Amino acid sequence: LEGDGVVIKGTKKRLEFHRYQVCEDIINLSKTRRKRVQAKEFVSLSRLDALQEIKAYLANTYDLSNTLIISNADGGAGYAKKDFDEIVGYCRQHEHFLDVFHLNKKIKDRLSFMPAMQGKLISAVEFKYDRHLTDVILDTIESNLIDELNTPENHENLRRLRSYLHRRWVDIKTFKMRHLSVIKAIGCCESNTYRVKGQGKYWSEDGAEGILRVLTCIKNNELEYWLSSEFAGGQLDIGDQEELKGAVRANL
């Protein structure tokens, strides 16, 4: 179970669409290609709408009382473990992971003033998962904030990074260290992000919502069913047909 938010260009302001995706397993098609089993995606400009859709799908499709749930997200607003607890409801076990891509980016962004320490901190946090060593490295960085590095901005970035790592320490623990009896099937959400944001377009809210709905149905193999339903007629407002064609081509 994964989720993320993606910002796209809007005609009046930036728009953010929210996506949750779920699958039962991942199988290897080749050395470089994997396929999700029973994958479903739920996307909307409204996080609450997407959240309610995936909650309803899980409740109506699965009995999770004896199921291990593995979730993965960037930890932003609406994507913390408690949010996924709400989606899942009652289950046998829920293991939540902080997305490694976003963790690395956070460390590099916050330590942009001291690149030489980025790799050391990433190693201590992700590969060794050593809380004491992590604190030692952070203390070392702080002690080296002298001369031109001794700025309020650098001190604030370091303080915020330390707080970020402490708050999310449990979620940072690696898949291998948790000794789970399943294969790693997370980390797909970022790589599967729709190319709507790469179309060079400025989307209206109605146009973006309509195209996201169509693309989600394509991903879920439900387009024909959805377009023939009464629900589609009141929700679909594509606008520019060229926008639709470009976005669809990018996702086929």
Residue ranges: model-predicted function:
Residues 1-70, 77, 82:
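RNase H-like nuclease fold core
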Residues 56-93, 100-252:
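Acidic/histidine-rich catalytic cores and adjacent linkers
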Residues 1, 96-99:
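Hydrophobic/aromatic beta-strand patches that form the interior of the parallel beta-sheet core
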